[in-house]
Amino acid sequence: KTKVWFPEGIWYDIYTGMRYDGGRMLEVYRDLSSIPVFSKAGGILVCADADELDARSVIKNPDVLCVRVFPEADGEFELYEDDNESCGYVDGRCVTTAMKYSADKDMFVISPADGDTSLIPDNRTYKLVFERRTEAAADKVKVSVDGKEVWAKNKYDKENRKLIVTVNASTESEISVAISKDTVALDNQIEKRCFDFLNQAEIGFVLKDEIYGLITSGKKTTVILSELKAKELDTELYGVLTEILTA
C-alpha cells in the first residue's frame, strides 16, 4: 500500500480504471503486478501501440499510435516528435500534433501535424481508447476526417468498459470523434470489485460471504464501514475494502 494525495478534481487509475474523487489523501492498495498511476479527468495519454513494437520500430516514429482519453473534463495534449537521432531539434526540426478533448461536446479532435512532417509517416493508424464507457457508446460514435464523416472500426471492451475506435488517416488531416456524454460510466462497479478481491483473498469462505453480504446489503457506506470495522478484520483486508467503497 501507499498514501496518495489526490488534488481537487476527478482521477482515474490508468490500470484498474477505478475512479477517485480528489481533494484528499487516501491509502491505495495494489498487488505485485500493478502500481498506482493516475490520470486526471480529461487526460490524454499517447503511446506507441504495444502490438507493433519490435527492435527496429522503437527507433522510429510509430505508424500506429494508441491514444487513451479519460472523460468528465476538458483536456489537451501536444505530441512532439523529432528524428530520434540528431540534434536537429535544436534548430526547430521537429513536428507537433495537437489533441483536444471537449467534455461538454464529448468530442476528441486530432489536429493536422505541424512542422517538419517528413519526420513522421504520411499516414497513421490511431487506436483511440475512450475510457469508462457504457456499451451504448459503440452505437453513438461519429468519426470525421477533414470535416467529412467516415466509417471507422469500433469495438467495445465490456470487461474494462472501454470503447476502441480505429482510424487510419493522413497525418496532415484533422480527425474528430464524437460520442455522447451520456455514455460515460460513472460508477465504480463496487460490488464486482469487492467480489473479485474477496474471491482471491486468503480468508475463510464464511467470512467472505458475511463481508460480501454486507457490501451488497444496500446500507449506507458509513454503516458498512463501521460494521466491517467491528468485525476486527485484518488491517490490509479492511484497507482494500475501504479504498473500493470510498474511492
Label the model's feature ranges.
Residues 1-6, 168-171, 180:
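Hydrophobic transmembrane alpha-helix bundles
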Residues 153-176:
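A surface-exposed beta-strand-loop module
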Residues 111-118, 166-172, 182:
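Secondary-structure transition/turn motif
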Residues 1-138, 147:
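Catalytic core of carbohydrate-active enzymes
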Residues 49, 141, 189-190:
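Short, charged, solvent-exposed linker or helix-capping segments at domain edges/interfaces
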Residues 130, 148-150, 224, 237:
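Sequence-structural signature of mature extracellular/luminal beta-sheet repeat domains
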Residues 141-153:
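A surface/secretory-pathway sequence property marking extracellular, secreted
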Residues 170-174, 180-247:
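Mature N-terminal, pre-catalytic/accessory segment of carbohydrate-active enzymes
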